[in-house]
Amino acid sequence: MSLFFKSIKSKIEETLNHTPQVNLFNNSNNGGNNSNNGGNNSTPTLTKTPSTTNFPYNDYKNYTYKYVYDNTDNYNFNNNNNNNNNNNNNNNNNTKENNFKSIRESASIYKNNEEINNDDNNTIINKKKIEEEEDETNFDTSLIPKLGHEDKDELESDHYITIWGNGIRNYKNCNMSSIGFSEMYNQQKIVLISTGAIHSSFITDQGNLYTFGDGLLGKLGHGNLESYSSPKLVEFFQTKPSLRVVSIANGGKHSLALTICGKVYSWGGNDSCQLGLGNGSSSSYYSLPQLINFNISYNNNNNNNNNNSTNNNNNNNNDGAQQQFSLSQNSSSNNNKIKIVKLSCGTNRSAVITDKGLLFTFGRGDHGRLGLGEQSLLMQSTPKLVQSLQGHFIIDMSSGGGHSLVLTNKGLVFSFGRNDQGQLGIGCFSNQQTIPKQIQWFQTSQQQQQQPINIIKVSAGGYHSIAISDNNDTYAWGRSDYGVLGTSIDVQGDRNLPVLINSNSVVVDNVKFIDVSSGFQHNVAMSIDGSLYSWGCNAGQRLGFKSDENQLTPKKCFINSKDSKPLLFTCGEIITIIVEKRFKEPIIKTELQLPSSTQSQQQTELSLPSSVNSSSDSNFNKSIIDNSSTTTIIKQTNNNIKSTTTTIITRPSSPTPSFLSLANEGKDLLNSTQSNFIEWMTLISKSKGLLNLIQMKATSSLPNLGLSIEKKNKDFDDINRQLKLLVNSNLSLSPLPDNIQSEIDRLVLSRNQLGLGLVSEYQTSIDYWLEIKQQKDLTFLNLSKLLNLSTITTTTTSNTTTTTTATTTTTTTTTTNLINKKVLVHQDEKQQQREKSETELEEEQDEEEEDSEIKNGTLTAIEIQQQSFYLVERLNQGLGNFCNNIMDSTTMVQPLTTATASSTTATATATTTTANTTNSSGIINKNFGESLRLSMEEIQLIVLETQKYAIKYHSLLSQQLQQCDDLINIHRGKLVEVQDFLNKSKLAQSLLEQREKLKSDYRFCKRNSIELSKKIEVIELDYDQNLCDDDDNNHENNSVNNNSNNNNNNNNNNNNNNNNNNNNNNNIDNNINSNSINDSSNNNNNNNNIEKLKNELIKLKKDEQKLLSNQQEINELIIEILDKYVPEFKIKLRANDKISSRIKDTGLLVTDRKFQHYDIIKTLSTHPHNVYLANFNDQLVVLKEFGIGDAFGKQIFERQVSLLKQMNHKCIMPIQAVFYDRNAFMQMEYISGGNLLDWCRNNNNDNENNKRRQPWEIQKIFQQIIQAIAYMHSNCIIHRDLKLENVLIRQDGTPVISDFDLSKDISANVNVTVFNINGGTELYKAPEMKEQNVKGSYSTDIWAFGVMLYKCIFQFVNNNNNGNNGKNNNSDGNENDNNNNNNFLIIREPFLLPEENNLPLPANHSDQRLISLLSSIFQRNPKLRPTAHQIAVHPYFVTSLVEDLLSSRTLIDCREKIAAFRAHISSLSEMAEEMSESLQLTVRREHLVLDFFQFFFKKIESNKLFCRLEVSFQGEKGLDLGGLSSEMYSLLFSDNQIIDNSNNSNNSVSYSIPKNSLFSKKFNLFENSGTESPFYLLNSNDLFNNNNNNNEENNNNNNNNNNNNNNNNNNNNNNNNNNNNNNNNNEENPLLILKNEFTIFKILGKIFLKSIIDGKPIPDCFPTSFFKYLLGVKVNLRDLEIYDPQLAQSFKKVLVLDNIEEYLSTTFEGLIEGGESIPVTDLNKEEFIQRNIERVLVGCRQSKLEAFKSGFMSIDSLNAHFALFSPTELQLLMCGNTLVDSSVLQKNFKFIGFPDTSSTPKDFRRAVDEMNQDEIRLFLRFVTGMVALPLSGFEKSISIIQVPLSQKLPCAHTCSYQLDLPDYNDFDTTKKKLIKMLEYVDGFAFI
């Protein structure tokens, strides 16, 4: 009998774990994924999975079952995993074999599936090769990860996955925030986790890889592009034991995995080659893992002993010498192969770390993301070693948004990639860092620590970085938005250096962190006590807090408690995922006792963050039966009731006797009852499935916006009604009052915002209901399948009563048969009916009423769901009682054997015992049978009720699905309606623009038609006149007729020419007129022309009609749209119609511009118009407002816009845009240089504030002004208000005429004036305007121009009015200034007295051309005044005033000469710039001189030397704003050594000349006399015979000197010999490719001239003889002494010696013809010395000097200036200020970003003041690239920009004259850093 009850128990377990053959949630084989038109979400299913092994026959108390989440499609009661676990427990020795067997079985299924899939992206490439190369025995078990942050807990626990953040919405149907991973997957534990942008991966302790989340681009590795809401096993890695995954890394679009045998696989997006598959990979993504081929191995060149020694050394110090590796296809030993131990992924890049600490990267490489240098800035398709990190042992790496952090075993941190937000922590903000750079701050921190900071953990976020030190301090740097740096609100701004965050955030708790993970804009860290802290952006509650407010400092978000503790955590882009360990509830243990009543036990909730819903919030019922060794605990949790009931069923304390008959027949009963019992238990399991389906509620990650949509929709309609009413009621008002216009604007803005909000919410609502409908569809389908399968018991659903009766009969019969076959005592059913109590009858009545309610459809879905919870509780309790009854029977079988054995020993005793046993067992058997039958009937009643409710719920679901469809269609219709409404607004705007375009085209066409009609009429009249003339002159001779015809033709030509002048805009008319002119001599041709013109006129008429028709169509469409959708456009249309066509035709009108779009800075003027200085789109502009309330103001605005549009001249104020906003507005250029009056009063040179403008500056300005006036007059426009205040000056010195309020178009004959009838300012009015009320003419503008020039010359220019032409001015000019002021006092204002016809002018003025010009202008009779064109060609403007002053020697002062020269060059450069000419020069640093010479040789003519030179260095990025060209000149002219020869007469320092300098010996262009002289002259040797020729003349000269002074001669010979030897040993001259010595030195002269034109000084390293030769001045002994002091000293001794014949026996050989016969005597020794001086300094290099001079003097206009310079002045012009004045330099300093409290600017100035000349020159070169101060001053200021505090040296940007200076705030530190900076000038790169 014991066997029978054990069999019953086994069948119950087998039935409960039986899987019905039905797919509940999908009919397709797509991996469990469902999709429809409503979305891409998949629904998680309920799977009933045993959490222990197979049912233990010897101990039923260990059996439990649980409802858990699973993503499979079947309603599983599968126990295969439990069988495996049981087998593993029973046979530990075969564990590995069984696992491999299971893996191979699953692999065969997987491979079969792969054969069906034909998608190239979903197949395993090189599968055969992988199988052949895989080594299944070479497992590296050290790679297997351990449980993260796991401690030794004695209590059992489960792993749960908690998700924070809105990124979870991207996961399909993920409506839970916590996933019971261990319950879902057979008690597996998670050991490693990685999260990408919106997908995640987990590795378990069994080596399985699970992924879930967004599946786009196949980044989940499942062979498809589907997304999954819960972890799904990656089956690819189950195919082989060697594919066990030990490490995983997720990126933005892809994933990497490392297997136990060291192989790396990648899958997902491959748009940037981030999968590392090589260039042969053509696909943009792979949905299955692909093997990365590492064809790299270590070199083993040493023997084994050496290798062992090396290994030992490496073990002691892993950061030793760099590893040797080589590329190899086949390695002889596996020990040499690369072994990967660490993976890292970024957005589009990947990285791996080897066991030798090497780093390989691949993928996207821009901005240095891969750290491979500038050579790999694109994409790297295969792993490549980061060479610069060799020698460091890399142990960790973190990849952020665009940057990466690398950690070594010594705690050093390196960073590379993007650095625009300071995320690299290297102390600057730069665009990129292409190679890894160490963060030095940790080694030289400001934190006063005794030792450097060692880092143990790094994490890179989107634009920020986090690091943890070995003492658990946390540092952050990079972008500081959203509080992501955790430094509180007190520390603002991006940080380019690490900042300690613990002290600012958690100082009260004194929390230290041991681990950290960074997302795009948030961070999560684990403290030492195991709690989690988060900070940064909390959008979507990704930090675990309810509020969406950002967290500026670390705040505790997850507590390590006794119920749960966090183990692993990771931050994705916008989500946070935590793996937590939840401890199981302690087992309740009780002593053996009799059954007791049900006790209530309150369930303890897990400690979770307040913002995260616990797993108890799941939308399904969870039933758990826990079993101890002595007690069965049945739990039923109801989420709606939020309570837990626990029933404790305790075994009896002592055995109970069993029945003999039951034992005898148990064996036969086992076989006969098996089939019926399985059917009954299957029915129960299906009922449980039905109840679970009923309890499932459709949920969505999207909000239900029903109420919000309804409210917004109502508001939207109300606003439209209000807008229509407001517009229609005020449409007649013109203009609209401000309050009404403001209200209309407000309503329009509100309507548009509501419309956009409705579009978004309708779309969200549609997605919401589609998601709900999808879930309800699945539930409906699954209910249909289960109900169809249950027809074995129920026949139809139409007749509920009949079905119930039939089912009851069938089930009762089955139950009765079961009990009868068990030989149990049953009572008759009628007897049972009679024994029913009244209570039971009442219950039946209630059931009948309930059946009636179900049948009549009065129950709702919610009520049915509530009943299902009650039924589940009853069913669980019934099953528990049933199991209890069966299990108790096993205790009754035990005494049976004992009683039988004892009866054989004594018959009498046995008889008595048997009788007693029978009687006793009879009673017990009866009670047992009754209890068993009742429990079975109770279960069957529950099953029937379940079917009733399921049928009704199925019907309700059908109705709900129809309602969902209706609601979705309604919302879709509303969405289309709102979108159409918004689109109509855009359509109306487009139609208005088309309407205006058609109107403009119509006007143009109409004008052409009228003009063409007039032309046809004129031609016809001319033709008729010609015919009449022919008739009248029939009897005249042909010559007379011909003359008459010619005259007529001439008249025709004149008429046609006039028509041409009036119709320049019509190309067709011009062609017609041209044809008419050419053919007017022929009457036949005239007829043809008339026909052509008439045809053209007909075509124009047709075009007019077509344009009118199109206008009418658009007008009708506009009216329809405006009335229904956008009534506010009616006002806009009316206002647009009122705008003059003159404004519209300019193309300047901006219809959507408003005054509020401008940021008004200040008001510049209020009369006669409001003029504002405003900021628009980060640009300063001037906004001029015109009142257009009346026709007068409107006409003023339209005329001014029309006039300015006609003129396009650089000296006339341009209009940028016009718009209407109640008034009319004109946007113009903002000119910051002030007006002409201020310009004349102030001088640009701060050192000469007492001096006025120079005459040539005035001449240049007024020359441009008169050209602009001539341009205006040529367009028939007069200004009528010219004055100094109305002429503005740009920064480049260009004058701009403005304020055209009084301007007039004479051709239009418009007599509109403003404010006074004549207009203009009184002082500038012409006499006729004052006396005759003339309203203005061309001559009035000429008079005003003369007044401006008169005031500038006589009031603001330092002229010699007293006729003192030849007098030298003092340097300070005070005497002349006083004389000029006295002369100015007697000069009156420029107006005419009544008796005067012209203005008296000073007769003794130095510039008579100026007096002549002014005399011609200041004439009373307007007709006598010159025109603007005549003034422009007046001698005063034609002849350069600079040249005139030079020729008259008026410019005596050196600075005046140089200033005049610079002014002349400036004017010529501006002319070249106007022609848009520039010189583009790209040079190589290593071949700078050669590139420069070739550039001049091929492209540079003398007339192009004034063009702007734009320099770029090959392979370097940079924009030449002056700095790059300065650097190029500095490198060209002995860049590495600045030589100061200003006070140098005897310098004995030897200088090292760089190879790329003009002075390098390899070019052989210059030479010096020896080490005592630093000066250079052109080389006297032949460039092409340098290696073979020695200078015999020098040797002779040395021999001559020998006779005079042996010691000196010996020294000279030695020096000369050394020089010759050096010359002979020089490498080949690169310049010899030019093949012409004269060309080389001519180009050299042009280079020097170009440097002067560009204002780039050269070093002062040339003697005075060089400049004297250029100017034609004779050299002397002093010049030789500068160049060759030793030789000059010898000559001096010769001069002082008497009787020279006695000491020096030499002749004039080589100096003059026949000199060998002329001895040197006291009489001719001076001539001898002078000739030697000329030979040494000039003669031996005469040809080179001539070639140089031909290039240097190649521009004739500059030679006149050079002729006026002295050699010293020319030297000053070329070399600049050799003595750098620090005070002059400091006037150009501009400090930016330093706070007022900082002392660094003051300390910096002081440090510069204390520099010596050498240091200050180095400073000048470091910042600007120049070696001397230009005499013309700096082109722009030197910007000194504050950067965050650090110990780094200042950094210079020569392109922009910028110096990045840390805010040291200490003088000693500032000075020390500056001096240190100058020591390493050559080590700094010029940016």
From Swiss-Prot:
Its EC number is 2.7.11.1, 2.3.2.26. GO terms for molecular function: ATP binding; protein serine kinase activity; protein serine/threonine kinase activity; ubiquitin-protein transferase activity. PROSITE patterns: HECT, PROTEIN_KINASE_DOM, PROTEIN_KINASE_ST, RCC1_2, RCC1_3. One of its GO terms (biological process) is protein ubiquitination. It comes from the Eukaryota. Residues 825-839 have a biased composition (Basic and acidic residues). Residues 1158-1437 form the Protein kinase domain. It catalyses: L-seryl-[protein] + ATP = O-phospho-L-seryl-[protein] + ADP + H(+); L-threonyl-[protein] + ATP = O-phospho-L-threonyl-[protein] + ADP + H(+); S-ubiquitinyl-[E2 ubiquitin-conjugating enzyme]-L-cysteine + [acceptor protein]-L-lysine = [E2 ubiquitin-conjugating enzyme]-L-cysteine + N(6)-ubiquitinyl-[acceptor protein]-L-lysine. The active site is at D1281 (proton acceptor), C1855 (glycyl thioester intermediate). Residues 840-852 have a biased composition (Acidic residues). ATP binds at L1164, S1165, T1166, H1167, P1168, H1169, N1170, V1171, Y1172, K1184. RCC1 repeats lie at residues 206-260, 262-314, 356-409, 411-470, 472-528, 529-581. Residues 26-54, 72-97, 1036-1088 have a biased composition (Low complexity). CDD domains: PKc (cd00180). Residues 19-55, 72-98, 299-333, 594-619, 823-858, 1030-1088, 1586-1628 are annotated as: Disordered. Pfam families: HECT (PF00632), Pkinase (PF00069), RCC1 (PF00415), WD40_RLD (PF25390). InterPro entries: HECT_dom, Hect_E3_ubiquitin_ligase, Kinase-like_dom_sf, Prot_kinase_dom, RCC1/BLIP-II, Reg_chr_condens, Ser/Thr_kinase_AS, Ub-ligase/GTPase-reg. Pathway: Protein modification; protein ubiquitination. Keywords: ATP-binding, Kinase, Nucleotide-binding, Repeat, Serine/threonine-protein kinase, Transferase, Ubl conjugation pathway. Residues 1501-1887 form the HECT domain. It is an enzyme of class 2 (transferase). PANTHER family: UBIQUITIN-PROTEIN LIGASE E3A (PTHR45622:SF60), UBIQUITIN-PROTEIN LIGASE E3A-RELATED (PTHR45622). In the N-terminal section; belongs to the protein kinase superfamily. Ser/Thr protein kinase family. This is Bifunctional serine/threonine-protein kinase/NEDD4-like E3 ubiquitin-protein ligase. It comes from Dictyostelium discoideum.
